[in-house]
Amino acid sequence: MILDFSWLPPEINSARIYAGAGSGPLFMAAAAWEGLAADLRASASSFDAVIAGLAAGPWSGPASVAMAGAAAPYVGWLSAAAGQAELSAGQATAAATAFEAALAATVHPAAVTANRVLLGALVATNILGQNTPAIAATEFDYVEMWAQDVGAMVGYHAGAAAVAETLTPFSVPPLDLAGLASQAGAQLTGMATSVSAALSPIAEGAVEGVPAVVAAAQSVAAGLPVDAALQVGQAAAYPASMLIGPMMQLAQMGTTANTAGLAGAEAAGLAAADVPTFAGDIASGTGLGGAGGLGAGMSAELGKARLVGAMSVPPTWEGSVPARMASSAMAGLGAMPAEVPAAGGPMGMMPMPMGMGGAGAGMPAGMMGRGGANPHVVQARPSVVPRVGIG
């Protein structure tokens, strides 16, 4: 460090020491140490007075003596710490004083700058050598500035080192906080161990009791009469099944009867509708093939009756008149065309086919369909009846 100061010109040494914070922080540190020392000393005095008052006053006995013995080292440590704080404050003050001395011994940077400016001017104007003595004197002054700064820095270094060497480290308190923490940890560990030891049998008993509970539940479930319960349920369902079967049959019968009733009602309605027409035809004589029912267009056929078996029938009956001769003028009971029976309706009778020679072979379908429950069916005669003319 001395070598560094020696090799540095005054421009650097002077600029460093004057550009720093100065001795203010050192004096502030010294004041803080002094305050700490005063607080420690006051605490030690107060603690000692309290312990002494308790031991000499109402608190007496072995506990009082033990407490006083335990507090004595702490009081001593407080007093020692207060002394060390006072020493640190003194050393900080000494360091600040050394700095002030070094600062005062160091050449001011302005003087160094002036010397360098003067040297430059003398060299610039030294045309004939007239400034040589002045230049030498200026250089000598500069060397002295160099030496002065180095001496100041060396002295400051020596003073700061002496201050640092006289400082002693603070002693640790007599109360071992780590020991207390370890002791508390050991106590907590012991408590946890004891609690675990106390709870282990309970937990083991609970775990061991679980299989027994499961086995008991399984045995109870196995003992339940599940099959018997199912059989009882099936037996309880038998009456319902027995009742549902006849009810379904009755429902089907009702449906069939409804269909038959509708068909009968339809047949009865048709017959009832034809009764007035039939009666009117009888009264007027047109329903039996009279002149009023046939019209003027059928006058050529009035004398030609149709034969159904051994019975003569009017030519207006459906089935006895050829399809080509049918006319809308034929009004009457026999002129109604045969209807195709609907599904589920009364069964009508188809018109019987014509026999050989053009003779009719059966009853009209309209008459056969209105015959009621027991219609009279006229069987066809398998013979050829000759046609007999009128007049």
From Swiss-Prot:
GO terms for biological process: response to host immune response; symbiont-mediated suppression of host antigen processing and presentation. The lineage of its organism: Bacteria, Bacillati, Actinomycetota, Actinomycetes, Mycobacteriales. It holds the Pfam family PPE-SVP. This is Uncharacterized PPE family protein PPE38. InterPro entries: PPE_C, PPE_dom, PPE_sf. The gene is PPE38. Belongs to the mycobacterial PPE family. PANTHER family: GLUTAMINE-RICH PROTEIN 2.
